[in-house]
């Protein structure tokens, strides 16, 4: 992978998640079920959070000048809009759509998720400004959008895609999955009784990789010690989502477990493999 893309990958992964989020999730686990409707839309809370980004722009003259050229949606003048950041500079471009979540009764959780989305967009825009400053040359393209992959009466899973291109391309997918009835942001470890899921899921993914390569010679996964970065195990907080039919899907970024041409890779984990490890059948069946 291109060294610059590797740096962008690490910096994006290091975007700090609000400290309050873990506490909020724990609180939400104890809340009584409530009925509500959740939609994706820029919220007043998210708009208020734009102050954070405005401060960043005011500190950086190049950023301020660039932001003044961004198409504005709504009544926010010369400031970031949470729908889209779009700019072209020389032969580089950025197009970042920032999602905002609304409809949760737990506003602390809702605001923390939106703050996380905002920080991610800040980091992407910061990288764009730094990489396209006057003393630097090169073509950079950053594109980010989002989509709802699961929307049932109980669950909402949202995928945010980030594609960075500079000589070569690198694609990431990030998910959040929410229990809409109970206002809970689900984490991978929260679905299981203990840490045994890490080993069990990792082993199943390896078996799926081997089977796929056996059936299709064009597919390659990094599994052997001869590979530069062989896949050993998933992370405790590995990227995941839950499908509409309540199946667990584990996701890997481009280059994470396979060559770039394989793109973002996903593995659906058979429920029978993990059923005895689950805390219950509410989410995974």
UniProtKB/Swiss-Prot annotation:
The chain crosses the membrane at residues 38-58. It is found in: Cell membrane. Gene3D superfamilies: Fervidobacterium nodosum Rt17-B1 like, Heat-shock cognate protein, ATPase. The keyword Membrane applies. It is a single-pass membrane protein. InterPro entries: DUF3298 (IPR021729), PdaC (IPR025303), PdaC/RsiV-like_sf (IPR037126). Keywords: Cell membrane, Membrane, Transmembrane, Transmembrane helix. Its main location: membrane. GO terms for cellular component: plasma membrane. It holds the Pfam family DUF3298. Residues 59-285 are extracellular. Coiled coil: none annotated. Residues 1-37 are cytoplasmic. Belongs to the RsiV family. Anti-sigma factor for SigV. Negatively regulates SigV activity through direct interaction. Interacts (via N-terminal region) with SigV. This is Anti-sigma-V factor RsiV. The lineage of its organism: Bacteria, Bacillati, Bacillota, Bacilli, Bacillales.
């Amino acid at each position: 992978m291109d060294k610059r893309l590797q740096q962008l990958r690490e910096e994006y992964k290091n975007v700090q998640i609000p400290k309050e989020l873990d506490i909020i999730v724990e609180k939400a686990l104890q809340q009584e079920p409530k009925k509500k409707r959740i939609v994706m839309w820029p919220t007043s809370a998210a708009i208020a959070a734009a102050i954070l980004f405005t401060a960043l722009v005011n500190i950086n003259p190049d950023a301020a000048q660039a932001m003044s050229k961004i198409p504005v949606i709504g009544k926010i003048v010369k400031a970031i809009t949470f729908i889209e950041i779009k700019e072209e500079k020389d032969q580089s471009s950025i197009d970042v759509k920032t999602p905002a979540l609304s409809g949760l009764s737990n506003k602390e959780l809702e605001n923390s998720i939106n703050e996380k989305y905002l920080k991610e967009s800040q980091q992407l825009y910061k990288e764009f400004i730094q990489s396209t400053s006057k003393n630097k040359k090169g073509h950079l393209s950053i594109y980010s959008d989002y989509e709802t992959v699961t929307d049932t009466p109980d669950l909402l899973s949202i995928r945010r895609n980030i594609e960075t291109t500079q000589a070569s391309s690198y694609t990431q997918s990030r998910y959040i999955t929410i229990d809409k009835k109970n206002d809970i942001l689900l984490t991978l470890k929260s679905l299981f009784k203990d840490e045994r899921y890490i080993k069990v899921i990792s082993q199943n993914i390896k078996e799926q990789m081997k089977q796929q390569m056996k059936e299709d010679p064009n597919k390659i996964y990094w599994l052997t010690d001869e590979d530069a970065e062989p896949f050993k195990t998933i992370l405790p907080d590995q990227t995941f989502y839950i499908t509409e039919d309540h199946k667990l899907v584990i996701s890997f970024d481009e280059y994470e477990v396979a060559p770039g041409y394989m793109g973002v890779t996903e593995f659906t984990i058979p429920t029978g493999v993990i059923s005895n490890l689950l805390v219950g059948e509410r989410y995974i069946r």
